[in-house]
Amino acid sequence: MLIHKLTKIIKQDTDDNISFVECDHPFSGRPRSQVILTFKEQKTRVSIVQISDMSKMYICIISRKGKKTDGDFGGHYEWQEVWFKPTLEDKYLPQVYQFIKLMVNNANKFYSKSMAISYKEAIAKLTNK
């Protein structure tokens, strides 16, 4: 699965800013079908999910928007999902990880709560000012 190959790349390149958790996604029934990255400096989480060999791999960037207030359980969150085809060639996986880091550093461009977008649409968001 793409997620397992991407996980190997991420493990080789994590630093003190990134915490890494590998787990089972509740809807997949497959082991290690979700990876959660927490970028401490940016206060942003990224969830990577692939539930089968033939399903798309989804990368969801999640960030807190606004501060927690009384009666507000955890604050307000914004997110955006980006999908990749399961046929993506392995040679592009290091670029996917770099893409994730770019998304985190430009998180404000990705919060719409809309349906998942393709990586091509996400690249367009990154390149638009």
Could you describe each region identified by the protein language model?
Residues G66-K129:
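Mixed-charge, Lys/Arg-enriched low-complexity segments
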Residues L2-N17:
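Amphipathic alpha-helical segments
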Residues D13-K68:
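Amphipathic, interaction-prone secondary-structure segments
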Residues M1, M54-M57, M103, M115:
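Detector for methionine-enriched segments
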Residues M1-L2, E89:
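Generic structural signal for short, solvent-exposed loop/turn connectors between secondary structure elements
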Residues H4, G29-P31, T44, S63, ...:
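Short, intrinsically disordered low-complexity segments
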